[in-house]
Structure formats: structure tokens, C-alpha cells
């Protein structure tokens, strides 16, 4: 995780990633939200809408037997459909280059990051697996937007363990 640097500015997206560990069971949680103090720039609103759509696309694939690869490809396609890129920026990319630069999610349990991964090599999903679904978009001159929930894989889909809203408002 990157902790950032410098002062926070009004209108800047702030990614808040929390991953508490239960003191008794030693199992981890993981949740990310993005918030903005003050007026939200139009491009941040557009990025946020694309991340929400990508998360919904990923979740529509999750069920027993679906692969982590299929989940990730659904995420990437939603980002591409929204006009964003895929992959790290090249050295000569403009500061406005905006893309998904990581996998869609990961298993979670005793470790915060564990298999299965929701990426291009992601295996078939099993009933009862705990996963995160966390698409994000990142832009060097503006910042990033990510939404992350924990889910449990079920026979016909998933159960979302998070109840926190995913809006951008700081208030």
C-alpha cells in the first residue's frame, strides 16, 4: 500500500483502505472507500462511476466455478468501455493517463492478501471462499478512486459482507 505524501487538498480524492484483524480469531477484514472533501471534480465523478460499474461487472461473474480470470476480465472490460486504460503508464504517458493498474481482488483470511487472486491467472472459485472485490482507477495528476468490499462466494453468486456506503462525499 502507498501512504501518499504532502497535504490533502480540497477536491482531491482520498483513498481510505482499512484492514482490521480480529484479536481473537486473527482473521482479517478489508474495505476501501474513496472520499473527497469539498466540491468533487467532474473527472473524479466520472472515474467513480466507472469504478462502480466495474465492481458491478466483476460481481456479476462471481459464483462457484467462475474463474478469478473471468472476474478480472469483466472488470477490465468495464473500465475500457468507460474510456479508461489498462496497465501501468509508460514513461512517455501524459499525466492525465488513467487506468486500472492492478488485479480486481484477492482472497482474505489469516493473511490480508492470499489466494485466490482475481487476476489474469485467477483459478476457479470455490464455495465459501472469502474474497475482496476492489477495482480502481489511478491518474498521476489527479489521484485515484477505489471501492473495495469483502464477499463470500456462494453457489449462485456471492454475499457482500460490507454495509458501508460507497459515495464520494466526505460528509
Language model segments and positions:
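Active-site neighborhoods and metal-handling regions in enzymes and metal-associated proteins
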Residues: 1-171
Amino acid at each position: 500500500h502507498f501512504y501518499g505524501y504532502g497535504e490533502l487538498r480540497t477536491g482531491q480524492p482520498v483513498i481510505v483502505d482499512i484492514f482490521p484483524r480480529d484479536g481473537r480469531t486473527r482473521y482479517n477484514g478489508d474495505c476501501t472507500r474513496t472520499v473527497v472533501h469539498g466540491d468533487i471534480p467532474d473527472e473524479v465523478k466520472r472515474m467513480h462511476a466507472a469504478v462502480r460499474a466495474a465492481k458491478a461487472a466483476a460481481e456479476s461473474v462471481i459464483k462457484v466455478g467462475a474463474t478469478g480470470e473471468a472476474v478480472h476480465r469483466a472488470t477490465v472490460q468495464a473500465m475500457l468501455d468507460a474510456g479508461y486504460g489498462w496497465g501501468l503508464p509508460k514513461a512517455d504517458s501524459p499525466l492525465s493517463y488513467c487506468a486500472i493498474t492492478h488485479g480486481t481482488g484477492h482472497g482474505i483470511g489469516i493473511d490480508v492478501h492470499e489466494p485466490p487472486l482475481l487476476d489474469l491467472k485467477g483459478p476457479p472459485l470455490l464455495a465459501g471462499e472469502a474474497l475482496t472485490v476492489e477495482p480502481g482507477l489511478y491518474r498521476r495528476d489527479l489521484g485515484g478512486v477505489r471501492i473495495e468490499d469483502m464477499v463470500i462466494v456462494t453457489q449462485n453468486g456471492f454475499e457482500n459482507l460490507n454495509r458501508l456506503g460507497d459515495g464520494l462525499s466526505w460528509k
